[in-house]
């Protein structure tokens, strides 16, 4: 599981953060996003993969397609609380943020459609993998609709 310490210190993810996730095969969503650095607030374009409750990023698309490659970073979306637009926060078009109780990460998509698709995909993953919602509560919610 991704630790807040690892995010805060910028350390590479450990293998246990993404062990058992075949990120190179059939991701729920993948594509280019520009991510703001944690300490030096520069923007870097990275290839992102969303799969099984993990948001992983790589230097490029080729690295994400290789079995056994190491992601540049991993976020467990089940630990996150919100994903929403953030154009007004970072003053850039197509920006969105992913937040937990202790950190916020900012991303920029290539266009409005991509931004909305990432927000929707990550939002679904947060709900599916959140530790605050039990399986029975999800089933209960589905039956009440």
Curated annotation (Swiss-Prot):
<keyword id="KW-0446">Lipid-binding</keyword>
<dbReference type="InterPro" id="IPR051707">
    <property type="entry name" value="PI-Interact_SigTrans_Reg"/>
</dbReference>
<dbReference type="Pfam" id="PF00169">
    <property type="entry name" value="PH"/>
</dbReference>
<feature type="domain" description="PH">
    <location>
        <begin position="26"/>
        <end position="127"/>
    </location>
</feature>
<dbReference type="GO" id="GO:0005777">
    <property type="term" value="C:peroxisome"/>
</dbReference>
<feature type="region of interest" description="Binds specifically PtdIns3P">
    <location>
        <begin position="29"/>
        <end position="53"/>
    </location>
</feature>
<keyword id="KW-0963">Cytoplasm</keyword>
<comment type="subunit">
    <text>Binds PtdIns3P.</text>
</comment>
<protein>
    <recommendedName>
        <fullName>Pleckstrin homology domain-containing protein 1</fullName>
    </recommendedName>
</protein>
<dbReference type="InterPro" id="IPR001849">
    <property type="entry name" value="PH_domain"/>
</dbReference>
<dbReference type="InterPro" id="IPR011993">
    <property type="entry name" value="PH-like_dom_sf"/>
</dbReference>
<comment type="function">
    <text>Binds specifically to phosphatidylinositol 3-phosphate (PtdIns3P), but not to other phosphoinositides.</text>
</comment>
<dbReference type="GO" id="GO:0032266">
    <property type="term" value="F:phosphatidylinositol-3-phosphate binding"/>
</dbReference>
